[in-house]
Amino acid sequence: MVSIRNPDSSVEHRILDAAAACILAYGVERTTMTEIARRARVSRPTIYRRWPDIRWVIAELLTVRIAGVLEQVPDRGAGRAALVDRVVAVAEHLRQDDIVQSVIRNAPNLAMVYIAERLGTSQQILIDALAEAIGAGQREGSVRTGDPHELGAMCLLITQSTIQSAQMVSKHLDAEAINVELSRALDGYLAP
């Protein structure tokens, strides 16, 4: 019997799992292609055939993790309240994700690319998901008018800042308060 599984997909999962393990064990800056290859039980050329350098591996890992959180937090229906609840839940998951937080805190040069210079794949995935939910909320009447992608991009900026900077304001806003205030900010921004 011939297997219908994609062996490349299995190898990529092993590589990304190994990259995550290395980041947790050694930190972002000390994670190497050699150690990822060793942990994934593949050769370095196998990794290099898929990604040109360590930054690309980490970027792919972040994309997989962030898209995975979006899948873990189910759509809660149409309307502004459901949209805001889902965004806040996704943000909370990402604030608690060890890999995401390790990159933000320990690889500022890499993080700054996606904070200040350009949209990453995972950010575009989030904007597209937001735009879809915003469009549904507009049709339902609970979200203000405007281009759904523009509104989604602004929601991403608001939410991304809480993921990146929550630790900085933890003296004033604990995790529950961050969720409450993020919810208010998004709800107010999206209200008709």
Predicted feature descriptions by range:
Residues 102, 113-140, 149-153, 180:
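Amphipathic alpha-helical packing segments from all-alpha helical-bundle domains
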Residues 60, 71-100, 151-155, 179:
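Hydrophobic alpha-helical connector segments
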Residues 84-106, 120-124, 128-131, 156, ...:
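Helical hydrophobic small-molecule/effector-binding pocket
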Residues 89-93, 134, 144-166, 175-189:
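Hydrophobic alpha-helical segments that form the core
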